[in-house]
Amino acid sequence: MDVAAAKALGAGISVIALAGVGLGIGNIFASLIASVARNPSSRDQVFSIGILGFALTEAVALFALLIAFLILFA
């Protein structure tokens, strides 16, 4: 196997984490919508926690993308 092919394969495997991130973000906002539908008065508190969860989950995606770029270009 060529080195370039191994790098491309490794970068592709490291990006698989993005599928989990997409599912996680979907679950966060689905739960956010469901909780606001049940109790509209708690919207502000639940929304801030949801945005925090989104940011932390998105950080995992950025780390996976960083690893993929390091594999490809380093």
UniProtKB/Swiss-Prot annotation:
The chain crosses the membrane at residues 13-33, 51-71. PANTHER family: ATP SYNTHASE LIPID-BINDING PROTEIN, MITOCHONDRIAL (PTHR10031), ATPASE PROTEIN 9 (PTHR10031:SF0). Belongs to the ATPase C chain family. This is ATP synthase subunit c. GO terms for molecular function: lipid binding; proton-transporting ATP synthase activity, rotational mechanism. F(1)F(0) ATP synthase produces ATP from ADP in the presence of a proton or sodium gradient. F-type ATPases consist of two structural domains, F(1) containing the extramembraneous catalytic core and F(0) containing the membrane proton channel, linked together by a central stalk and a peripheral stalk. During catalysis, ATP synthesis in the catalytic domain of F(1) is coupled via a rotary mechanism of the central stalk subunits to proton translocation. HAMAP family: ATP_synth_c_bact (MF_01396). It is found in: Cell inner membrane. F-type ATPases have 2 components, F(1) - the catalytic core - and F(0) - the membrane proton channel. F(1) has five subunits: alpha(3), beta(3), gamma(1), delta(1), epsilon(1). F(0) has three main subunits: a(1), b(2) and c(10-14). The alpha and beta chains form an alternating ring which encloses part of the gamma chain. F(1) is attached to F(0) by a central stalk formed by the gamma and epsilon chains, while a peripheral stalk is formed by the delta and b chains. PROSITE patterns: ATPASE_C. It comes from the Bacteria. The lineage of its organism: Bacteria, Pseudomonadati, Pseudomonadota, Alphaproteobacteria, Acetobacterales. It comes from Granulibacter bethesdensis (strain ATCC BAA-1260 / CGDNIH1). It holds the Pfam family ATP-synt_C.
